UniProtKB/Swiss-Prot annotation:
Its EC number is 2.5.1.74. This is 1,4-dihydroxy-2-naphthoate octaprenyltransferase. Belongs to the MenA family. Type 1 subfamily. InterPro entries: MenA (IPR004657), UbiA_prenyltransferase (IPR000537), UBIAD1 (IPR026046). Keywords: Cell membrane, Magnesium, Membrane, Menaquinone biosynthesis, Transferase, Transmembrane, Transmembrane helix. It catalyses: an all-trans-polyprenyl diphosphate + 1,4-dihydroxy-2-naphthoate + H(+) = a 2-demethylmenaquinol + CO2 + diphosphate. Optimum pH is 8.5. It comes from Mycobacterium tuberculosis (strain ATCC 25618 / H37Rv). It comes from the Bacteria. The gene is menA. GO terms for biological process: menaquinone biosynthetic process; vitamin K biosynthetic process.
Length: 292
């Protein structure tokens, strides 16, 4: 039976920046419109965290029962390592997704009821990433889904629930955050190219191959860097977003130098940290820019 620490590891807490950063970015965009509502931001954060934990457990369950996780590096796999039964991991996934759905329902009803449909699509996307008979994560569409759900959907959704409108500042943040979120998955799938290929999990990294996947990762980081300068058109204070550059460069180091396997594990951590620092810095800059 898995210990509490193993259940926590199975939730993959290092992926939580993917949940937190879009909400921070969207709230900063709402603050730019003089419309930040902090209790709505907290509700959005609850939705995002619950969904990310839910999708991580769902991936553990789905990959585990398929045998995809039998020869993995990285965080603990509860089902693949036979530390927990598939049913218990599935229950954890469904519980997390249900809590996210409940928080999302409350947020939508208090903001814009049509967002319920968006939430339903998000939950379906979380499950179908590796679940179902034809998971899109096994067909090379995982990166696109991460970009959409953790970029435009999460950032602009957060901005809209607070401001009831979106603008180009929110869109720029959405694209940058989506690119950074996508880069985390690209790094993960770069590490897993050998095992994914053996398991017939045809991720985008498997399709592109090692060299082009490394180029894609660096290109996604560059997108966020360019958009930092674009956001300076709103307020010069957005230059503070460049505080994340050293973290991004550190993350990119092992990718540029051709390292693989376990040597890429720190890349996921550093990329997620860079994304969170960037989102906090730019959101703070936008809020301060409206006060100054």
């Amino acid at each position: 039976m898995a210990s509490f620490a193993q259940w926590v590891s199975g939730a993959r807490p290092r992926t939580l920046p993917n949940a937190i950063a879009p909400v921070v970015a969207g709230t900063g965009a709402a603050a730019w419109l003089h419309a930040a509502v902090w209790w709505k931001a907290l509700l959005a954060l609850a939705v995002a965290v619950a969904l990310v934990i839910g999708v991580n457990y769902a991936n553990d369950y789905s990959d585990g029962i398929r045998g995809t996780d039998d020869d993995r590096v990285g965080p603990v796999r509860l089902v693949g390592s036979r530390l927990a039964t598939p049913r218990s991991v599935l229950t954890a996934a469904m519980t997390s997704l249900a809590l996210g759905a409940l928080a999302g329902l409350v947020l939508a009803l208090l903001s814009a009821p049509w967002l319920i449909a968006v939430g339903a699509i998000c939950i379906a996307g979380a499950w179908l990433y590796t679940g179902g008979s034809k998971p899109y994560g096994y067909a090379g569409f995982g990166e696109l889904a991460v970009f959409v759900f953790f970029g435009p959907v999460a950032v602009l959704g957060t901005q809209y629930t607070q401001a009831l409108r979106v603008d180009w500042v929110g869109l720029a943040q959405a694209v940058a955050t989506g690119a950074l979120s996508c880069s985390v998955l690209v790094a993960n799938n770069l590490r897993d190219i050998p095992t994914d290929a053996r398991a017939d999990k045809i991720t985008l990294a498997v399709r592109l191959g090692d060299a082009r996947t490394r180029m894609l990762y660096q290109g996604l980081l560059a997108v966020a860097g360019v958009l930092t300068f674009v956001l300076m058109l709103a307020t010069p204070w957005c230059v503070v977003g460049l505080v994340a550059a050293p973290l991004a460069l550190r993350a990119a180091g092992p990718v540029r130098s051709g390292r693989g396997g376990r040597e890429l594990i720190p890349v996921l951590r550093d990329t997620g940290l860079a994304m969170l620092v960037w989102a906090l810095a730019v959101a703070g800059a936008l809020a301060f820019g409206q006060l100054s």
